[in-house]
Amino acid sequence: MARLGRFGFLALAVVFHLIYAYSIFDIYFVSPIVSGMRSYGVEREPGAKAPASRLVLFVADGLRADKAFQPAPDPSPEDGEDAENNDPIYLAPFIRSRVLSHGTFGVSHTRVPTESRPGHVALIAGLYEDVSAVTTGWKLNPVNFDSVFNQSRHTWSWGSPDILAMFKEGAVPGRVDADMYGEEIEDFTMDATQLDTWVFNKVKELFASAKSDPELDAKLRQDKVVFFLHLLGLDTTGHGYRPYSREYLHNIKIVDKGVQEIATLIEEFYGDDRTAFVFTADHGMSDWGSHGDGHPDNTRTPLVVWGSGVAGPKYTDGKAVTGHEDGFSADWGLDGIQRHDVAQADVAALMAYLAGLDFPVNSVGQLPLEYIDASPKEKALAALANTQEVLEMYRVKEAQKRAALLRYKPFEPLADHGKNSVEEHIAEIQVLIANGSYDEPIKRSGALFATALEGLRYLQTYDWLFLRTIITFGYLGWIAYALTTVIDLHVLHRTSDSKRTVGSTIFFTSILAALFSVLLYQKSSWQYYVYGAFPIFFWEEVFARRKALIAGREILLGHVRSFGGYIASGFQLVAFVAVLEALLMRHQVQSYFHREIYTVCFVLGSFWPILYGVDFVRQNTVLSATWAVGCSLMSTFTLLPVIKVENINTITYGALLMFFTGLFYLLFEDTILKHSKSSGHAPGAISSLGSRVIMGMQVGMVLLALIVTRSSVSSLQAKQGLPFGNQVVGWFVLVASLVLPFFHRLYPNSHYLHRLMVLFLTFSPTFIILTISYEGLFYFVFCMTLVTWVRLEHAIYVYTARSSAHYGGNNTVPKKPGLNATAVIDGQEYRYRRLGLADTRVALFFFFLLQSAFFSTGNIASVSSFSLESVFRLIPVFSPFSQSALLILKLLIPFAIISANLGILNRRLEVAPSALFMVVMSISDVMTLNFFYMVRDEGSWLDIGTTISHFLIASFLCTFVAGLEFLSEVFISGVDFGPTTKAIGASITKTVGGTAGSDVVDSQSGPEDAANSKKAEGLEGSETIRQNGGSV
């Protein structure tokens, strides 16, 4: 095929990584939902009643297990009580009384993503949706699978439209009633307890209406009915004020009081003691007011069950009690009562049993027998029915898998023959129950249930080896293809031709045809065909351009001839891999607080200029010192806590640094740029004044952002909500600061320092508005370090070029033709040099700084580590997509800054456009492939969430780098470096004569080649490498 150019390569990189990023969801997180199963319930004697006639489910959205049971100072003492009294009390006395005297309790462990939709689906359907379902709860997406609500005779529900609507629309028409409040009252900055009191009041209204409505009264008195109270107040309060705040703790008191009132109301209405109550939460809440990832604070929720059919508390006399060994509940004061932990999906099975319903057909929850008060026979029958439901799901999934594959290998423990057959297992358990033996059937049902889950797991992962092999070859093929393309475009300058043979064409075509035939027979989705096509395309291209790899090796490593040369090259390779592995080590640490590897790297990096000798440091003392200071300051941010508390003083310090930096540049711009003139435009007094006016407006926006942010924070902290005027001004500053830079086109100043200052001031207001702590300080230090890096890399480039010219006679580089090439940028033709091994260091530095831009203010686990408090200054009501967009905007700002700096560095080092970006994309997938094999879909919830984030961040990094390349083109279009750098090139020429210039052009070429190239080109000295007016 035709050789891809720069933009073709970048486009291919984006498409490939976007498609392959989705591969983990086709491999690790395939939806477990199947259809066509029959339902199972407990088979009772005719006339026998279910454990309860009705079920009441309370879900306290966002309630952490520890906060529900821990004692704490009263956050809202009653009138007449001492407000200064800090004696701890139990915030949920009614719930606690159920634990102590009436029911069974434990901790319900959720899975990632710890969001409302997946949590409620697990609770009510017994199903763990695949991870990609996280955002489906942000809009109406009916649950297209069975649930406890769907199995009920009728369900009444009250609460948030985000949860209730999806269960109502997904159930049998008319089976679920949903009474929902409007989304506009979900205001994170106001008193969220009103969301819960609204629900409690609506429940009271329903039962009050039944007294005068015989039809409603009759419906309420039927059996197998469910009442669902979704209590969103705690989640909203936790986001706005965090779970250790007085507001959150007060909300717990409100919920407890409301639950008591509703429980009493229902008991009095029916008067038959035939109601079962379940109190739990869909997910927890982290200390920084977020959820979504697998942190234990997000995955551990309370579970308290009481009422009809529920076992009472199990006390022991001075003996250790099972369930408290982990120490998590040590300060709850419940050590004398047995704690029964469950998986969240188990709650669905428990509710179905208590209400006398069939188990939801997609449920993987195991009935927790410790929670039920029943005879041994009833428990044995319930355990059997629960197991039959899961086995039915296994039977249907296996039949589907068997029909789709060319050759199917059955799951041996449940193979359809002899003693292992499902029917044989069920028959044996039924015989034992009929003979009056119950303990053994319960054990066997539990073992068979676990085997059935293993069988489902076997079917779920059946295609893993096949798919992971394809994906692995795809990533390895991309790495090889990318390196080949970089060598072809930027080392050989397209002088090597592709060469295919008949044999190779037949070989690769045959593999593709065989692969597609298998996929077609198995009726695979279209993504599988794309997954398979990429590795074949990449490896075929690498084979066809194998001569480019050989020629590139001779140019890049041809100078390594002696033993000492091999030792030096090996040492450089070890150092390169060590830094890359250090980044990998950072990701492999399964914790939120171990970012110190970046601190170590920055400290070591501060000594980097010394590697070029004392003479270099002496010539660039200020630059080297600034770099050391920048690295030292950057190293401190990864030592600061990830969990940040809103601190207006820290926000102010960062904003003032931004403001005074812009003001200083505005006042002394002529002095700073006095040695520079734009080669493309010589601004006069009017244009200079216009440029200063626009920049002055940018500086003013920084100050206005600080003022409105301080005002908004004060109002929000005082619980007065967000004033409308503040919201308007905040949005005005955000939008205006991003629009103002475009007016600089009217009065252009093309110096690269001026361009970087414009970018710095462009994003400063956004960073101020969306920061809650030290992020503004980080932004200032990060920008300072990047500018220093660009100048330092250029200084090293000039210094090493001058040194190689001085010692040209001893140059060990083999004599190769000087492959100087040209490119048209901004309508002008520029010459550029080919890449060398030293440029991989630049790519590695960029790679490291790119990651530090994210991890210096947060953790890798998920965006949930970034507080929502800053977003409330612009959007105080629940709007997940808009709020997430603002958080992502804040995360992307440092990346935009670094892209501009690398684009400038690309030109200062006189390499072709995109050359350095392409090198970065070539090496980044070493990390991506590492994380691909680290992805887990089982184990601890923290592990699952963290590994998903690892892979996606690494995978999108390459895509993001491609996007940054295009962004940098916009930012540095027409940029000029002034005559100072031209003077540097001239000084090299003056020092070493005519050879210096071409050495700078092509540091890999020997002096004779440089001279020949110069003569052939008809150019002199540094003019051989004209770029933006001849600058180096």
From Swiss-Prot:
InterPro entries: Alkaline_phosphatase_core_sf, GPI_EtnP_transferase_1, GPI_EtnP_transferase_1_C, Phosphodiest/P_Trfase, PIGN_N. It is found in: Endoplasmic reticulum membrane. GO terms for cellular component: endoplasmic reticulum membrane. It holds the Pfam family Phosphodiest. SUPFAM superfamilies: Alkaline phosphatase-like (SSF53649). Signal peptide: none annotated. This is GPI ethanolamine phosphate transferase 1. The lineage of its organism: Eukaryota, Fungi, Dikarya, Ascomycota, Pezizomycotina. It comes from Aspergillus fumigatus (strain ATCC MYA-4609 / CBS 101355 / FGSC A1100 / Af293) (Neosartorya fumigata).
